[in-house]
């Protein structure tokens, strides 16, 4: 058995017992530490994680970004691999990470790699969803969680190496689960636009959905992913249209409160 790498997996979870065997199973035998921060679990998430040797910490929900910040603060290992419960380190990525640590990792502060989504029975390898380069491996103390509530990301000062192995992502097991996210992300978008004081624009409402479809399906070759590629481009365009339409709705409700009551 090879020695474990000086890496801690940092993860947050709520009712992820069904996903943890895949995600933690892909790393448990070669990382030094697993830190899982949980909240409000009712499905045995804690017990499943402990079966993989994870340190499980219960912490009240603070939102995705801040919850991940708390999890990161609990890590002791020299390096951190930040994962979501619905992700899996592929064999190719595992090999790349091992090669990185047995090679030139001392010259870098972190590493990024492509994230590949399993959707509608196939891997998505084109369009807006791929390669989705993700910075997830970094020196402890050098990276921190930043970004917006729905698009949190690691920010890092220093050089970053690109690895080629894919991080597998099982984020949308059904069409229903994807459609539900349109409303959730629409809420975040509306809140951000209101905070910025940005007015509704008819031009953006009409043109942005068209552009998002054209970019995903044509420029980024989404058509090569068959019907799933077409669905993703269409759904992205529709989600964009809904977001800007909700901004219009909010302005109407603000300007005419008595009529919208």
Role assignments for model-derived ranges:
Residues 6, 32-33:
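Residues at the starts of beta-strands that form the adenosine-phosphate
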Residues 32, 46-76:
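Conserved donor nucleotide-binding strand/loop of the catalytic core
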Residues 21, 43-52, 92-93:
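Acidic helix N-cap motif at the loop->helix transition within catalytic regions
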Residues 1-26, 256:
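N-proximal low-complexity "stem/linker" segments adjacent to membrane-targeting elements
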Residues 26, 38-47, 61, 84:
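A conserved acidic beta->alpha catalytic loop
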Residues 8, 38-41, 121:
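Structural signature of the Rossmann-like NAD(P)-dependent dehydrogenase/reductase core
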Residues 66-72, 78-83, 90-253, 260-261:
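Catalytic-site signature of metal-activated, phosphate-bearing donor transferases
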């Amino acid at each position: 058995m090879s020695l474990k790498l000086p890496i801690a997996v940092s993860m947050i979870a709520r009712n992820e017992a069904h996903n943890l065997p895949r995600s933690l199973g892909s790393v448990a035998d070669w990382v030094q530490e697993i830190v899982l921060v949980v909240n409000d679990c009712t499905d045995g998430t804690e017990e499943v994680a402990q079966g993989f040797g994870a340190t499980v910490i219960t912490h009240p929900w603070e939102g995705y970004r801040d919850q991940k910040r708390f999890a990161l603060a609990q890590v002791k290992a020299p390096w951190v691999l930040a994962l979501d419960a619905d992700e899996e380190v592929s064999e190719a990525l595992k090999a790349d990470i091992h090669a990185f640590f047995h090679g030139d990792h001392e010259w870098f502060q972190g590493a990024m790699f492509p994230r590949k989504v399993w959707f509608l029975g196939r891997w998505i390898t084109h369009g807006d969803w791929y390669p989705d380069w993700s910075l997830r491996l970094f020196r402890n103390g050098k990276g921190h969680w930043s970004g917006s509530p729905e698009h949190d990301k690691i920010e890092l000062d220093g050089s970053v190496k690109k690895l080629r192995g894919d991080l597998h992502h099982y984020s949308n097991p059904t069409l229903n689960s994807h459609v539900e996210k349109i409303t959730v992300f629409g809420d975040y978008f509306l809140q951000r636009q209101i905070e910025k004081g940005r007015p509704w624009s008819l031009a953006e409402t009409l043109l942005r959905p068209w552009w998002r479809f054209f970019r995903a399906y044509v420029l980024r070759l989404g058509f090569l992913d068959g019907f799933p590629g077409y669905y993703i481009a269409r759904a992205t365009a529709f989600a964009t249209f809904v977001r800007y339409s909700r901004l219009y709705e909010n302005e109407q409700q603000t300007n005419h409160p008595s009529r919208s009551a």
